Amino acid sequence: MVITVKVIVIVAVAAAVLSTAFAVAGQSFVDLRATAQDAELKKNTIGGHAAGYGLYETSGDVLDPVNSYGNVSGPAVIDPDKYLRSFDYGRVSKLANGSTVREFTLVADDRQVMEIAPGVFYNVWTFNGTIPGPTLRATEGDLIRINFINNGSKPHSIHTHGIHKSEMDGVFETINPQGKFVYEFYAEAFGVYPYHCHVTPLEEHISHGLYGVYIVDPKTPRPQADEMVMIMNGFDTDFDTENNFYAVNTIPYYYMHHPIEIEKDKLVRVYLVNMLEFDQINNFHLHGNLYQLYRSGTNTTPDEYTDMVTMSQGERAILEFNFKYPGQYMFHAHKTEFAEKGWVGLFLVKDPSQIQSASGGGSSSGGYNGSISSYPLTTTTISGDVGT
């Protein structure tokens, strides 16, 4: 017992000395493990008031995505509200045979340091400056042209799940820094797909943020709905292959502090993708309701009517539901550790007269010119047609 007390005292003194040394040196030092522990201990608040969900303990503070923090200038890595309902339909043109061409530009960078939670900074790797990258959207049969530019310091690529030729798979044509590549393929098999860097070590490129969502709509459109994209992700901030923070759309606890407003009785469609590294499974549980589950989104007939779906890494689904009653309804990972470390949010269901219109946004290539000629970098050429 005496030895134990001495050890504790020594450790405590050493910790105090180290903490003082960092403070005296004037360094911007963040103890990420302590931050993760604090995130578990502090109660969540919304606008300074308790949310009423005492079982879910959160940081109490949430990152404001439109402001700058600490020593890092510029916005946070994503605005979850803006991302939620934004779809990039690309620059549209027509081929001689009448086929639609959708041209996108994705720029990879691996040199940014951004804040992912209050006081927690991370070396983010991004497509077009955000995690996740822009949501690319097309209709089955469209010709997809992705102008890829590697503005990073490491080799990168783009691997899009779905049907395409081998040379368009993003595995063998690694693009070196300052290089370019043009991916071309037809949008085949409607559904929801992830895209991500496929350079090894793969877990490093994905866990740092090089991923996004690619949606192929069926030729006969799905019923009109309030559509949104949710990527389940997380961050290993101390690099021990165990995540310290979990989220949907990158910012932990964000939708607890900023509930997603939806209209009572209106059809909601969620494109859900699991891009969480290091943990083998993730899931989505909805309170007070059930949803029609379309696994991979490759069928127009639902696979299941449920309030819970579990996914492995890279799996995805479409969820459709509507709420009969107004109020606040939680959604979260049913792996409690994930929820208590950030993967938790709220839907705020309102009568139509009380809610602003929630229309989907759009952009042209995530703010980048769709033409690859706009970027005077080394070009990697390809040969052959793109298939039919």
Question: What residue spans do the PLM features occupy?
Answer:
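Copper-binding active sites and cupredoxin-like electron-transfer domains
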Residues: 2-388
